[in-house]
Amino acid sequence: MGNRKLPFGYQMRMGEIVRNEPEANTVQDIFLQYTLGASLKEIAEQMSKTGPSYDEGKSWNKNMVARILENAKYIGADSYPRLVDINLFEAAAEKRQTKQ
């Protein structure tokens, strides 16, 4: 396992969890791409080519994308700053349920 302690999209600054803007933008893009019909694999491939690194020395894969789509911290759970609109999060969750 790499060095990532916080979910992708966040960083610690002066003892506080804050947005990591480049990663936060990527998180929003992942949710948008997924709700518009892209597969987990397609998103992972795109992120490997153009997105910031998920974890040092690791390429993106569909499991990393799935973990992002399932993580309620992105809508502000557990006192994390919200990165994704709740409607977008719920649309992605609904799509994931219909695929199972």
Language-model features: where?
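Conserved catalytic breakage-reunion loop centered on the nucleophilic residue
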Residues: M1-Q100
